[in-house]
Design a protein with these regions (language model features):
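N-terminal periplasmic accessory domains that precede
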Residues: 6-10, 30-31, 63-67, 87-111
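Short acidic/polar hinge/loop motifs at secondary-structure boundaries
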Residues: 35-80
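Structural signature of Gram-negative outer-membrane beta-barrels, strongest in the C-terminal barrel
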Residues: 346-492, 496-501
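Transmembrane beta-barrel wall of Gram-negative outer-membrane proteins
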Residues: 108-142, 149-236
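Extracytoplasmic beta-strand/coil segments of soluble accessory domains associated
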Residues: 1-49
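Face-selective signature of the C-terminal outer-membrane beta-barrel domain
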Residues: 167-183, 205-385, 406, 563-565
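Gram-negative outer-membrane beta-barrel transporters
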Residues: 501, 518-662
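C-terminal beta-signal and adjacent terminal beta-strands/loops
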Residues: 426, 502-504, 510, 650-694, ...
Length: 763
């Protein structure tokens, strides 16, 4: 489904769509030819939006949208779910390393069509002279979820130019690579005016990215202490534009707040009951990344010892104008919002230093490997009051492996490799999380209505609160894993047991504080004789306080991942030219808050909301489990130039369960802002008893989805000595999804088959 942003979640059961746990996808790093794709300056979010067609397309804190990645140029993909080298940082969950094709002389053409998308790709390679290569490519993708609905579609256009040169000299080899890339994504939806009363209702999000990178690799020959040097420089600039248009119909008199940048009082003006509203978001992210490292060979007898030393620096800045709208025609009239240029947000500099030692020792037929590393990270460009401005974050990582002596079974060798690792991984906050928009708290002091519009008056006190998250720190994920790999006569088995605990993920959290305002009494005004707007100095006034909440980003989310991953592959059985591959996993993922949360009950007594805010140790706890296995039969018949693949996707079970929360607060805030510890007898108080959460222990049943299975089929035929490949696929060709009972209800399941055709041509 390409109608919504597609973020990656590694090692998660029944992945949560809750943005409070988005650090898992934000903390997955993507490298293309060594250059990272940074989303730290992505601020494309339509503030105060509530419509699904808008919020479902917001991935400003979700990391990389994988829809924007083209796959046809890829020659190799490495997915590091475990503990990567300390050379790679600013990540918590995993690493995706993509290497693209280089060299060759073929002209490649690919055409693909399925039930939801159409793809065109054209690529060409050149080789000439002494080590020169050039690769170019162009691809276009069009997708809509429902082919009958052309008003909602996603489009992608990308092109790439990759130039390289290899120098072979007497003492060393030199590899230079230069990449220039362009990518565009157009995503939008709109309603047919004929079904919307003739009014326009549309959303459009456009994205254009230009990237340039240079990489230089020097490798020494022979027994030299300096083995290799790598230099990498990359930069990218993006044009991000978002537009939302809809027609507003108000049911009551609504005030619009004037533009005020500091604490002050002013009169508001009244909005018309109906109008056309438009709000734009203009983002211009700039990302620069520089990296240098050297690999040294240490002269130790009988031991292979290599030392990697390096540093990298990243800059993230947004030069856009931010939220753009008309104060007198706001898109969301019930919310307080003022525009702030993204360019006013400071640039953030991320500097890292790292060192890693790789030790390899052979003792008889045993081989031992030990990899130890340390990465240090510091953020520059922050004000002195930020906690991160004074901290260096250290990420130690360790991997060890033991390759046992081979065992002879029926005159064939069985090899076994045992490995284990532990390491910390850290992700820095985005600039939007460090420097969010200020909060504008508008408190109505006077609201006088008169049938004569000229006599109406609304007076507002505005507080402007700096929301800079000075206490925010990096998100840390501690990974531990143990794995075993066996290889016997072409049969391979691997199994990994892992545990990942990220207790400081980024989370939007409420923060309450008391705010003072005046309340003017208009009961004494004679609406029949008044000839001008009421004057404040002529009205009785009283002082009031109100507990108002605002949102801030804290390290308050915990994601605990546990599980087992396994893979079994057989060698190809020659009589039937078939190989069996079995992959599967069991995942258990726990989501919960890791810091105390403020909540104010919505109960109203005597026309006033409860004047207390509860402080609770837990507000969210859920545990998901999943177990699945994929069986793939892959048949390749060279004589017929025919390939057939049949896979069975078995979901043994999945479940979700919520935990009973503590209904009592640990403390509460009074109207004056003071914090008082909760006492047992508070639950008998007329007002304080409403702080006891009545539904905290409800709905703790575990919901289990039983076994289901889908069959997928693909056939590939080669023509003209393999220059033309034609493939047809059908996913969910057959399924087993029986009905099941859940809480006395019969749950009926069904799946829709999905098929398509693709052609690959090489000339």
């Amino acid at each position: 489904n390409l109608s919504r942003p597609n973020s990656i979640r590694l090692r998660e059961a029944n992945r949560s769509n809750n943005e409070q746990y988005a650090t898992s996808s934000l903390g997955t790093s993507f490298l293309i030819d060594g250059a990272p794709i940074s989303s730290n300056a992505n601020l494309q979010s339509l503030k105060n939006a509530w419509e699904p067609q808008v919020t479902a397309r917001d991935f400003s804190i979700m990391g990389v949208d994988m829809r924007s990645l083209t796959t046809d140029d890829i020659s190799q993909v490495e997915i590091v779910r475990g503990i990567p080298s300390v050379e790679y940082g600013d990540l918590t969950s995993g690493l995706i390393k993509i290497e693209r094709k280089r060299g060759g002389k073929d002209l490649s053409l690919r055409l693909k069509a399925d039930m939801g998308s159409k793809l065109f790709y054209l690529g060409k390679g050149w080789e000439w002279g002494k080590g020169w290569t050039l690769n170019t490519s162009l691809d276009y993708l069009y997708s809509n979820k429902d082919p009958r609905n052309t008003l909602e579609a996603y489009q992608r256009l990308s092109s790439s130019l990759r130039l390289g040169r290899k120098f072979q000299l007497r003492a060393y080899s030199l590899d230079w690579q230069m990449n220039a890339d362009y990518g565009a994504s157009l995503d939008g939806a709109k309603q047919d005016p004929e079904t919307n009363g003739g009014y326009e209702d549309s959303f459009q999000s456009d994205y254009h990215r230009v990237a340039l990178s240079n990489k230089l690799m020097l490798k020494r020959r022979g027994q030299q202490w300096l083995k290799a040097i790598e230099l990498l420089g990359t930069s990218s600039y993006e044009w991000q534009d978002m537009k939302r248009i809809r027609y507003i119909n108000l049911q009551q008199t609504t005030a619009a707040i004037r533009e005020m940048r500091n604490n002050s009082e002013s009169d508001a003006f009244l909005l018309p009951y109906s109008y056309r509203a438009e709000q734009n978001v203009e983002g211009r992210p700039l990302n620069i990344f520089l990296k240098a490292n050297a690999c040294l060979a240490l002269p130790i007898k009988f031991v292979k010892d290599e030392l990697l030393l390096g540093t990298d620096w990243a800059l993230d800045k947004n030069l856009g104008r931010g939220q753009i709208f008309d104060y007198q025609r706001p898109l969301y009239p019930q919310h307080s919002l003022r525009p702030r240029p993204f360019s006013d947000i400071p640039a953030v500099h991320n500097l890292s230093l790292y060192a890693e030692n790789t030790l390899s020792l052979k003792a008889g037929k045993n081989k031992f490997e030990l990899l130890t590393g340390l990465r240090a990270t510091h953020l520059f460009g922050l004000r002195p009051d930020f906690a991160l401005s004074h901290e260096w974050t250290l990420d130690p990582r360790l991997n060890l492996a033991w390759t046992l002596p081979p065992l002879s079974i029926r005159e064939k060798a069985l090899t076994m490799r045992l490995s284990a690792g532990i390491g910390q991984h850290s992700k820095s906050p985005t600039i939007g999380q460090l420097f969010p928009d200020p909060s504008y708290i508008d408190l109505t002091e006077l609201n006088y209505y008169h049938p004569n519009e000229a006599l109406r008056r609304i007076h507002v006190r505005t507080y402007v609160v700096d929301n800079s998250n000075i206490a925010l720190r990096l998100a840390h994920n501690l990974k531990t894993e143990v794995s075993a790999d066996l290889d016997y006569d072409g049969y391979r088995l691997s199994c990994t047991i892992f545990r990942e605990d990220m207790s400081s993920g980024f989370r939007q959290m409420p923060l309450y504080a008391p705010y003072h305002y005046k309340q003017y009494d208009t009961d004494g005004i004679n609406s029949q004789t008044i000839t001008e707007q009421p004057r404040l100095e002529d009205l009785p006034v009283s002082d009031k306080y109100e507990l108002i909440g605002r949102s801030y980003t804290g390290n308050g989310s915990r994601t605990l991942k546990e599980g087992i991953e396994y893979t079994l592959s057989t060698k190809r059985i020659e009589p039937i030219h078939t190989r069996l591959t079995i992959t599967g996993a069991w995942f258990r993922t726990t989501y919960q808050n890791s810091q105390e949360i403020m909540e104010r009950p919505s109960t109203v007594i005597s026309n006033q909301q409860i004047p207390y805010v509860g402080i609770y140790e837990d507000t969210d706890w859920s545990r998901n489990q999943l177990s699945n296995t994929n069986f793939t039969l892959d048949t390749d018949i060279p004589r017929l130039q025919l390939g057939v693949s049949l896979s069975a996707q078995c979901a043994w079970f999945s479940s979700t369960q919520r935990k009973a929360l503590n209904p009592y607060p640990t403390a509460y805030m009074k109207i004056d802002g003071s914090i008082v510890s909760w006492q047992e007898d508070n639950q008998d108080d007329t007002l304080l008893r409403w702080l006891v959460r009545r539904n905290a222990t409800a709905n703790t049943q575990e919901y289990v989805t039983p076994f289901s299975m889908n069959l997928n089929f693909k056939v590939t035929k080669k023509l003209m000595q393999g220059r033309i490949n034609i493939a047809m696929f059908c996913n969910k060709l057959w399924d087993y999804t029986p009905n099941y009972n859940d809480g006395g209800l019969v749950i009926r399941r069904y799946v829709d088959p999905y098929f398509g055709l693709e052609t690959n041509i090489k000339l």
